[in-house]
Curated annotation (Swiss-Prot):
Recorded topology in the membrane: Multi-pass membrane protein
Name listed for the protein in its UniProt record: Transmembrane protein 209
Gene name per UniProt: TMEM209
Taxonomic classification: Eukaryota, Metazoa, Chordata, Craniata, Vertebrata
Organism: Homo sapiens
Record has Nucleus as a keyword: yes
Glycosylation sites: 57, 274
Amino acid sequence: MMQGEAHPSASLIDRTIKMRKETEARKVVLAWGLLNVSMAGMIYTEMTGKLISSYYNVTYWPLWYIELALASLFSLNALFDFWRYFKYTVAPTSLVVSPGQQTLLGLKTAVVQTTPPHDLAATQIPPAPPSPSIQGQSVLSYSPSRSPSTSPKFTTSCMTGYSPQLQGLSSGGSGSYSPGVTYSPVSGYNKLASFSPSPPSPYPTTVGPVESSGLRSRYRSSPTVYNSPTDKEDYMTDLRTLDTFLRSEEEKQHRVKLGSPDSTSPSSSPTFWNYSRSMGDYAQTLKKFQYQLACRSQAPCANKDEADLSSKQAAEEVWARVAMNRQLLDHMDSWTAKFRNWINETILVPLVQEIESVSTQMRRMGCPELQIGEASITSLKQAALVKAPLIPTLNTIVQYLDLTPNQEYLFERIKELSQGGCMSSFRWNRGGDFKGRKWDTDLPTDSAIIMHVFCTYLDSRLPPHPKYPDGKTFTSQHFVQTPNKPDVTNENVFCIYQSAINPPHYELIYQRHVYNLPKGRNNMFHTLLMFLYIIKTKESGMLGRVNLGLSGVNILWIFGE
């Protein structure tokens, strides 16, 4: 109970919160009080010494009134702060709680008063005559399986330390929790009553160790009726008898709930996790809620994050050598997505459509053996020479397919990559499954396929060069694949160098410098982006005599403005 001003309806938690706020405010008001005293002292010193008026040569009497008002204000604030500090220190809020409540509320010993547990009296009071107003009220009987003759009665000796609002009784001495009937001495002390204490009660809301569990709350608040005789042998006179009775009744009630179909959750029973019972009691429920071990991640997240961070830092270093701007890496994801979409919409989708169109024309011409994806690359090259007047696009298609002898896999993989809008099935260090078997190194990786079609597309856009009669102008000048090596000492060499096949890795050679971007799934795309970025910023958007901007190939739009 609070000392000083205390509202009778204030709860224990509210008073605890108020006490903690006062403890915190005590430090703050002391600091404010010292600050206000300091300010008032400074102003008083200025008033006596007239420092400001003499230094600035101003009229003193208006300034004196202003200083007087400020000094008075700070002095009053200081007095108020010191009064609050004195109040919180000398007459703090205190509580009377039990040791259990002190532990739960996290209170210090210096600010609370603990009350020892009260002994239960063994006083027995004879039963009172039944109340005729609630005869026959037994529809809310606690347990249908219990015999009326085996239900003991609660006496007021079991409620020591309470100021309860006792509730009504049923006929034959049966105690009821009827909220409409209030307790009176005439109704008898031997009836089971509501254990809800009145707010101003100075005692803890516990009845010894029995009431320490929250599971006993239903005996205080549930609308339950006990039909039993009023023999003196049925009265409870000590805690042991009460505890035994509560345990047995809880056991019965819990078994009923576990066996009922409505018990679908372990949390539906308020007594589920209380007491040490056998696992068999909960077998029915635990079958519905089985715990399963989670699968351990193959790669620790911390290692992955560290690898991503180091990869990003390495990429920043490489890009800084090209553009002197580390902020470019913030746009890299956007550029990569646009570039992948450009490859898909500009090269892959039209290529698949043209291949299907040529295959249809081959069937109409009576050459089903020359179906693209079924015929060998040698047969397709010969057909391109023979049937060039009839199918002029066949020679161009053959250039895209001249990558691997396995034409069936190559065509099917190009079709898969063209689906999804942004090459969603792309795998940088492998490819797709083929005829029910996993990808192996005898098949080209997706990176090799994309690099090949990209170079072939630019071969078709660059003008013919007499030095490269096969028509591979871009591939011959700007793409080198191991085991061949570019001439790094030549300042005019500007090419993409594939330094590893499996897993694929690409580097950029420009003006005797090697730009080696981090390995991984985006290495090829980032190398190509750097190649195009150099063309845009250092070559005025020109690749030889071809403009890669809006008036030409129109690929530099991916970098924005």
